[in-house]
Design a protein with these regions (language model features):
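Catalytic active-site module of serine/aspartate enzymes centered on a nucleophile-bearing elbow/loop
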Residues: 272-275, 280-301
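The serine-hydrolase catalytic nucleophile loop
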Residues: 78-89, 104, 250
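Short beta-strand/loop motif that positions the catalytic acidic residue
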Residues: 232, 238-240
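N-terminal cap/lid segment of alpha/beta-hydrolase-fold proteins
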Residues: 26-63
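Short alpha-helix in the alpha/beta-hydrolase fold that links the catalytic acid
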Residues: 234, 248-257
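Hydrolase active-site cap/lid region
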Residues: 27, 32, 162-209
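Alpha/beta-hydrolase active-site loop
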Residues: 116-137
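Conserved alpha/beta-hydrolase
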Residues: 89-109
Length: 301
């Protein structure tokens, strides 16, 4: 009996050893403060779901006609002072591109609840933002496009298949695999520091099955974006960070090509993480930002 306890203790120690010796540090994104940017408050209805949405409109200086990009939020609660969003917004605004950054439903000044909403419901928030630009804003825009950030990359093609007013899509660290495949990849990364990778791969599917039943995840479980992407006939830019630990970048690129979507602009920034953040400065990668405004300004349909 004592021998069995000793053996079990040794096994536990071996399994916990990676947790003892590994150190994973976390840093917050570097970027501008909201107070440093010039914007206007807006309010617009989502008539599809009977809720009111708030947001911010960032206009470029001294430019009468301009492209306008609508940001689509990533997962979870969203706040206006999110420096990942603001870094992208600030760069676009400085380079002659207007940005409409809605408050995510249930966050800041927007009604509704993102928990329990599926992607089709969340897509109506973006469609409503586009409706606002066309019908109420009095803006002299040259074209309207979508910038889906992380989870927003799953929502963007839904909006574009239902609106003929969209001229371009940017998917920034957005997965082209299914939601469950993305979650499984992320779970392996989250579990792996506490044990060995082969065990993490065994444990991850169990965690995924549990998460599938959670209120915040069950409405989007099993979602596959490819059927939507295959309907898109406008310019698309998929941007990935090569060191992204939230989604399987190689699998995402392979899947796009496997479904004959290689005509989309697809670029991986080798040192970028999720959100295409520079690993040293923890700012959004400048090469990506330059590619972003070039893509938007050069897009013609």
């Amino acid at each position: 009996m004592k021998k069995a306890i000793i053996i079990i203790g040794i096994l536990i120690l071996i399994l916990l050893l990676p947790y003892v010796i590994k150190d994973r540090s976390y840093r917050s994104t570097n970027g501008p403060e909201l107070s440093e940017l010039k914007y206007s408050e807006i309010v617009f209805p989502n008539n599809y779901e009977n809720i009111q949405l708030g947001g911010m409109l960032f206009l470029p200086e001294a430019k009468d006609t301009f492209p306008i990009a609508v940001i689509i939020h990533g997962s979870g609660r969203s706040r206006r002072n999110n420096k990942w969003y603001l870094s992208t917004v600030s760069h676009l605004q400085r380079n002659g591109i207007a940005v409409l950054l809605p408050d995510k439903r249930g966050c800041e000044k927007s009604e509704g609840a993102w928990i329990g909403s599926d992607f089709e419901q969340l897509a109506t928030d973006t469609k409503s933002a586009v409706d606002y630009i066309i019908n109420e804003s009095n803006l002299h825009y040259s074209k309207i496009g979508l910038v889906g950030m992380s989870q927003g990359g799953w929502i963007a093609p839904i909006v574009a298949t239902e609106s003929s007013d969209i001229s371009f899509i940017v998917s920034m660290s957005g997965a082209s695999v299914t939601t469950d495949e993305q979650l499984d990849f992320e779970m392996v990364y989250n579990i792996e520091p506490y044990t060995y990778k082969f065990l993490a791969r065994l444990i991850a599917p169990i965690s995924v099955r549990q998460i599938r039943n959670k209120d915040y995840y069950s409405p989007i479980a099993g979602f596959d974006p490819i059927p939507y992407w295959k309907q898109i006939r406008i310019p698309v830019f998929f941007a990935f960070g090569g060191n992204d630990t939230n989604l399987p970048v190689d699998d995402c690129v392979k899947r796009l090509k496997a479904h004959n979507l290689e005509h989309f602009k697809i670029k991986t920034y080798p040192n970028g993480g999720h959100g295409i953040l520079d690993p040293e400065t923890y700012k959004v990668n400048q090469e990506f930002l330059n590619d972003l405004d070039d893509f938007i300004n050069e897009t013609n349909i």
